[in-house]
Amino acid sequence: AGGTGSTAIGAASSASGDQSAAVGVGASASGANSAAIGDSSTASGDFSSASGSGSSATGSFATASGAGSTASGENSTAVGSLSEASGTNSSALGNGAVASANDSVALGNGSVADRANSVSVGSAGNERQLTNV
């Protein structure tokens, strides 16, 4: 733990950001006020959090939760294994969901939101219906 007020727990874990926390083997929290929890998780964006094995939160104010999830856009959120939120202010919710455009939301397993200011509940060739609305 090299950052001021930081904590690192686990073999080869590192908490170099000020007020950061890294918990798990190889976990790394280098962003200020960041938290990485889980084997090989990374929280490098300031005020970011990554939880789950291999999760990564590199954008400022980003949150990645789930094994292999990635939140690289500023203010992005990825929840679910292998989910990815790379657009600014984007959210990917569900296993393998991808929100790559700015201000986009991908909802559900395998959903893709690749247009700005959009909400997707499926992907090309894997369309879904909204019911009981």
Which positions does each model-derived feature cover?
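Small/polar residue-rich beta-strand/coil "junction" motifs that cap repeat-based extracellular fibers
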Residues: 10-11, 21-24, 38, 74-133
